[in-house]
């Protein structure tokens, strides 16, 4: 379930998070009892005439967890009628061409698949031939197969277009603001190629704190967040266009600190390919704003023509800003315990976790780490028999993620989301079997664990970082947080598979790199 602004705009347009296979193929989610089915997705792609082409790989998944042998991907590009050549890019994959227009690649090691699509295997380079001309289009049929399973196919649209080189400033804007204050940042486009760029689309990756102060009709928004802006202006070779985009820093921004925002330029055709990819995963591109049109006027340019390219190096398509947040605006995370009753043999459910009492939200989306750790000590006389996958047995400061979700441990460490808003609760349900009735049996919920690990360390009120789990408490015994029963409300849920990243239609790799501020290698 995507609950927080389409999972923070796909966890920052690395589409990090939740392209679940069932989203692209709803039938796969219909019944867990059905036979296992393979699935494959390959992005629509636009190639520039005369260019070296593009490298991409299919997204592979299954309707349930399975380890397969003889995993094979077949690329059938006969429909492209000699305008595109498809060749192996991965040195470790064995490929052969049984006939013209067909490439068959096989992995000889066992491969694990599940509902979470992943890319990187069977990557190919798609190169326009000398025959290719602007306006050519065709279908690349991609089929996945494995021993004992029915093959699955997906047809991707391949188009040939004119080559351009969109570029953004190489340096980020350095800004400063306090929570609740307004500021503006430049949105700049240069044409560093030799062909006029007929329109462009900016795709934004903004931290939660950075919000639009004004809406425009040629931009799209979701839950108050700026997602994209489309421009129809023709940018001549060597020309630069720029606009000042107004923003406001949210009042619930953590301070002091830093927040980041990036934008990436795409041609309209590339953006259409990207949109198709996102829509296949069930993600919203937002709604047009209710304001005037944001224009990109020309400005004095220092851009120089760099030869005929089609954005083959996406690193010159992005730029952004760093906002130094000044002032003081912290957060108080509160442990949530529970109070349970039952007789011997009963299985009772402890709903435990963390609540953010503010005044600031916590956004760890850049690093991808959970906002805190939730350590759960099982009460005496009970056994944990139902444990979610986001909880792992804990031994000292070491969590055993190989046995995540395994019942029977006395101590667990659970991971909440990478973001928590003010007033938001994130809880996990643990089923406890009462083996022996012990009056006032007590367990604990501890957040902000002191460990050599990532997480929040500057809690405003450490005194409420521990709450009790009471089983068969005597009258007058407190439970939950602060002695009261927990406020359950609607949890945003805990993210399983925090490291599940996938490549996004030719832009995901470098966008993930920008979010994590490290180099991404597919």
Placement of each model-derived feature along the sequence:
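Low-complexity, acidic Ser/Thr/Pro-rich repeat tracts that form intrinsically disordered stalk/linker regions
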Residues: 1, 27-53, 60-63, 85-102
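C-terminal membrane-anchoring or membrane-association module
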Residues: 1, 497-522
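C-terminal segment of classical bacterial N-terminal signal peptides
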Residues: 19-28
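Extracellular/luminal low-complexity Ser/Thr/Pro-rich, glycosylation-prone repeat/linker regions
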Residues: 30-35, 62-64, 142-166, 266-330, ...
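A surface/secretory-pathway sequence property marking extracellular, secreted
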Residues: 31-35, 68-112, 199-236, 369-413
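Short beta-strand elements of extracellular/lumenal beta-sandwich folds
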Residues: 38-69, 171-196, 336-370
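Low-complexity, intrinsically disordered segments enriched in Ser/Thr together with acidic residues
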Residues: 108-135, 232-276, 415-444
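Membrane-proximal extracellular "stem/stalk" segments
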Residues: 314-484
């Amino acid at each position: 379930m995507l609950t927080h602004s389409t999972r923070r705009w796909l966890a920052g347009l690395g589409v990090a998070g939740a392209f679940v296979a069932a989203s692209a193929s709803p039938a796969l989610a219909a019944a867990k009892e059905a036979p296992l089915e393979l699935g494959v997705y390959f992005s629509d792609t636009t190639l520039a005439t005369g260019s070296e082409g593009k490298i991409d790989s299919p997204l592979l998944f299954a309707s349930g967890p399975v380890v397969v042998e003889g995993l094979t991907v077949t690329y059938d590009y006969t429909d492209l009628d000699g305008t595109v050549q498809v060749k192996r890019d991965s040195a470790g994959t064995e490929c052969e061409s049984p006939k013209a227009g067909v490439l068959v690649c096989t992995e000889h090691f066992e491969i694990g698949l599940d509902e979470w699509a992943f890319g990187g295997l069977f990557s190919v380079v798609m190169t326009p031939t000398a025959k290719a001309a602007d306006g050519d289009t065709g279908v690349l049929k991609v089929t996945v197969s494995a021993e004992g399973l029915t093959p699955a196919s997906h047809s991707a649209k391949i188009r040939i277009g004119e080559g351009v080189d969109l570029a953004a400033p190489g340096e980020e804007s350095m800004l400063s603001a306090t929570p609740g204050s307004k500021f503006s940042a430049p949105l700049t486009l240069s044409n560093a190629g030799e062909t006029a760029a007929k329109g462009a689309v900016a795709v934004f990756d903004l931290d939660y704190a950075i919000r639009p102060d004004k809406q425009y009709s040629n931009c799209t928004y979701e839950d108050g967040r700026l997602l994209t802006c489309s421009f129809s202006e023709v940018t001549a070779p060597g020309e630069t266009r720029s606009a000042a985009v107004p923003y406001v820093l949210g009042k619930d921004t953590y301070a002091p600190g830093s927040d980041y925002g990036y934008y990436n330029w795409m041609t309209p055709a590339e953006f259409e390919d990207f949109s198709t990819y996102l829509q296949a995963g069930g993600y919203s591109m937002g709604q047009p704003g209710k304001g005037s049109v944001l224009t990109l006027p020309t400005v004095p340019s220092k851009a120089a023509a760099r030869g005929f390219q089609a954005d083959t190096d996406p690193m010159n398509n992005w730029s952004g800003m760093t906002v130094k947040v000044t002032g003081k605006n912290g957060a108080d995370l509160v442990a949530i315990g529970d109070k349970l009753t039952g007789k011997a043999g009963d299985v009772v459910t402890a709903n435990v976790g963390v609540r953010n009492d503010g005044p600031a939200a916590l956004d760890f989306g850049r690093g991808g780490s959970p906002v805190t750790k939730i350590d759960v000590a099982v009460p005496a006389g009970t056994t944990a028999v139902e444990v979610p996958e986001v909880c792992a047995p804990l031994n000292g400061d070491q969590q055993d993620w190989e046995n995540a979700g395994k019942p029977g441990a006395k101590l667990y460490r659970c991971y909440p989301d990478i973001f928590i808003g003010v007033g938001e609760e994130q809880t996990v349900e643990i089923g406890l079997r009462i083996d022996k009735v012990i009056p006032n049996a007590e367990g604990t919920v501890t957040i902000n664990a002191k460990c050599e690990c990532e997480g929040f360390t500057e809690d405003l009120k450490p005194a409420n970082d521990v709450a009790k789990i009471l089983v068969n408490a005597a009258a007058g015994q407190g439970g939950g947080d602060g002695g009261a029963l927990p406020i359950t409300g609607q949890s945003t849920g805990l993210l399983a598979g925090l490291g599940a990243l996938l490549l996004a239609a030719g832009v995901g790799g470098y966008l993930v790199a920008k979010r994590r501020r490290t180099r991404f290698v597919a």
